[in-house]
């Protein structure tokens, strides 16, 4: 029933997203990471070796704990009733996907940009990006929103979809645990330089194949949505390594090529300037409507991934 649970979860996310009133596993994961970090920092030596060990313990405990706990719940529910087991898996599969939430948040940015309210647009984009937004121009806000749609299409949709097709909701939520660790601990500053290193490497490994699949699917999605598949393919091949992370530029490069715009480049994080290479060619100025176009491609590649995954699962399993 895993295929049915994945399909149902995809539909649930598409229709409802993540309602604010509904408890989300990622919130619990975040609290667990913070609690573990606090305890480990208090007990381990404040040395590079001690911090590496602490990060390694978090990187082991959280994914393993997530898989065991969710697996036991799914197993227990299925023993009570196969339909209850399916419902639990379907619900968690929906929570592991983030397409609807990503589209909603990025389109909030689009709405404020179209209204011409730059301060409101900066505030809206600050909810979905990690960079400093208080001094961004309208073009900078638009770029940030498009980039986050492209990047999160991989780790917010394609990667969890791939893992749930392989191992159901428990494996998808285990991936979300790894991704949440990376979001909270992977900072190149004094506090997390060593503590966040092992969680970051684990996230790189977990995203290696999904991100490349997402980049290829984005090229196909560009053709389906009336954007430039040729440009997506060309820039993906050229610029997919233009990022400190081995995975982040996979979908960003395909998106930039599909739209004919330039993404990435230098940015400020916590008041510090970070020089970063650009992605894509500025064949035209970026515009707010590119946020909508990016979301259309994100949904198209998500549907392609779902159909392809279900077809392969049906043949193999």
Q: Can you name each region flagged by the protein language model?
A:
Residues 183:
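Glycine-rich phosphate/dinucleotide-binding loop and adjoining beta-alpha-beta core of small-molecule
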Residues 1-174, 178, 186-317:
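Hydrophobic alpha-helical transmembrane segments
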């Amino acid at each position: 029933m895993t295929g049915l649970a994945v399909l149902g979860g995809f539909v649930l996310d598409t229709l409802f997203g993540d309602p604010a009133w509904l408890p989300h596993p990622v919130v619990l994961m975040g609290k667990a990471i913070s609690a573990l970090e606090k305890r480990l920092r208090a007990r381990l030596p404040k040395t590079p070796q001690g911090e590496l060990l602490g990060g390694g313990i978090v990187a082991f405990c959280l994914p393993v704990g997530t898989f065991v706990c969710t697996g036991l719940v799914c197993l227990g529910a299925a023993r009570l009733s196969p339909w209850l087991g399916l419902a639990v898996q379907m619900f968690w599969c929906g929570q592991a996907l983030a397409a609807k939430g990503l589209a909603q948040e990025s389109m909030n940015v689009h709405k404020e940009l179209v209204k011409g309210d730059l301060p409101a647009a900066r505030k809206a984009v600050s909810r979905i990006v990690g960079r400093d937004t208080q001094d961004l121009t309208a073009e900078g806000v638009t770029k940030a929103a498009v980039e986050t749609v492209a990047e999160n299409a991989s780790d917010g949709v394609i990667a969890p979809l791939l893992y749930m097709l392989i191992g159901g909701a428990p494996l998808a939520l285990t991936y979300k645990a790894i991704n949440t660790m990376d979001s909270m601990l992977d900072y190149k500053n004094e506090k997390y330089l060593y503590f966040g290193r092992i969680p970051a490497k684990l996230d790189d490994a977990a995203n290696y194949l999904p991100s490349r699949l997402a980049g290829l699917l984005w090229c196909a999605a560009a053709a389906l949505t009336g954007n430039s598949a040729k440009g997506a393919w060309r820039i993906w091949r050229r610029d997919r390594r233009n990022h400190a992370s081995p995975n982040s530029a996979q979908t960003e490069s395909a998106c930039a090529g599909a739209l004919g715009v330039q993404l990435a480049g230098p940015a400020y994080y916590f008041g510090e300037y970070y020089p970063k290479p650009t992605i894509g060619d500025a064949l035209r100025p970026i515009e707010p409507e590119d946020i909508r176009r990016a979301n259309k491609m994100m949904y198209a590649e998500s549907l392609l991934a779902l159909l392809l995954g279900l077809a392969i699962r049906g043949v193999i399993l």
